[in-house]
């Protein structure tokens, strides 16, 4: 059974690599201060690790 992870975008993707923006869009984070709840899977954890400097993660 997978737990959920709440992810909030706290920094903008402007000026970052296009791959960073692609990861954020894939997670459903398009604007600052937007939060989404995702399943805690290895794939999602990998996406979070790639852009962890822009996010706030709550277990």
Swiss-Prot record:
Keyword field contains Ribonucleoprotein: yes
Pfam family, one: Ribosomal_L30
GO terms for biological process, alphabetical: translation
InterPro entries for the chain: Ribo_uL30_ferredoxin-like_sf, Ribosomal_uL30_bac-type, Ribosomal_uL30_ferredoxin-like
Cellular component aspect of the GO annotation: cytosolic large ribosomal subunit
GO MF annotations, alphabetized: structural constituent of ribosome
Transmembrane segments: none
Keywords annotated in UniProt: Ribonucleoprotein, Ribosomal protein
SUPFAM superfamilies named among the record's database cross-references: Ribosomal protein L30p/L7e (SSF55129)
Similarity section: Belongs to the universal ribosomal protein uL30 family.
Subunit-level organization: Part of the 50S ribosomal subunit.
Name listed for the protein in its UniProt record: Large ribosomal subunit protein uL30
UniProt organism field: Geotalea uraniireducens (strain Rf4)
Organism phylogeny: Bacteria, Pseudomonadati, Thermodesulfobacteriota, Desulfuromonadia, Geobacterales
């Amino acid at each position: 059974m997978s737990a959920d992870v709440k992810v909030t975008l706290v920094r903008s993707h402007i000026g970052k690599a296009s791959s960073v923006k692609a990861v954020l869009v894939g997670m459903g984070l398009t604007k600052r201060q937007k939060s989404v709840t995702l399943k805690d899977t290895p794939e999602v954890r990998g996406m979070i690790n790639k852009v962890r400097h822009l996010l706030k993660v709550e277990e």
